[in-house]
A protein has these predicted regions:
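Acidic, serine/threonine-rich low-complexity disordered tracts
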Residues: 1-79, 101-195
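Acidic/charged, solvent-exposed loop-and-adjacent secondary-structure segments enriched in E/D, K/R, S/T
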Residues: 82-100
Length: 195
């Protein structure tokens, strides 16, 4: 699955997922790479790599490393005694296994009481609102979608830590096709390839 990343309607990078199935194990690799430039000068660079490992459909391991404009962040998660053990740059501790990694491709996240940041391991309690069905045109293709908003339950969080993201899933397949959020500009992830 490939997404183009846009900031203020300008293409700045890519988010690519690959899926590998080996018997009852599924490995999901994710790569995000973008940069913000002005007049040929790079102002901000972002690169993240993550690997999710599932056994019989259940997450058993997750690792990620992120370079956020020179600031290093990471997450390592494993399952022990029916809970997640998280070692992340923002959170170290445990979390219930009904929480999901915030990588968006897994539609089940709409039912999760919280998501775990794929960048830092921070646990984000979430409220999910179904906003309706919409027809979207992306990269020359038309999709019938289900539109959701994900927001933070914790009203005490400062503004740049709050979750407020719109996600669109294709109605028939439940594949993720678009994301939209505001953070120092208007951001969109738009599906370009699904294989």
């Amino acid at each position: 699955i490939e997404f183009d990343i846009y900031r203020n309607n300008k293409h700045i990078g890519k988010h690519i997922f690959s899926f590998e199935k080996i018997e009852n194990k599924t490995i999901v690799r994710s790569l995000i790479d973008f940069k913000i430039s002005k007049l040929g000068v790079t102002l901000y660079k972002y690169n993240a790599e993550g690997v999710e490992t599932y056994l019989d459909g259940n997450l058993v391991n997750f690792t990620s490393s992120t370079d956020q404009n020179g600031k290093k962040k990471y997450v390592n998660i494993k399952v022990q005694d029916d809970e997640y053990l998280i070692d992340g740059s923002s959170y170290k501790g445990s979390a219930p296994i009904e929480f999901l990694i915030g990588t968006w491709w897994n539609h089940s996240i709409v039912k999760a009481p919280a998501q775990i940041s794929a960048v830092s391991g921070r646990v984000i309690k979430q409220k999910v609102t179904f906003l309706g069905k919409e027809k979207l045109n992306l990269d020359g293709k038309s999709y019938n979608t289900l539109h959701f908003n994900f927001s933070s339950n914790d009203k005490k969080l400062n503004k740049d830590k709050k979750l407020n993201t719109d996600i669109w899933y294709e109605e028939e397949t439940l594949n993720w096709v678009k994301a939209s959020f505001k953070k120092k500009g208007n951001w969109e992830y738009r599906l370009t390839l699904i294989d």
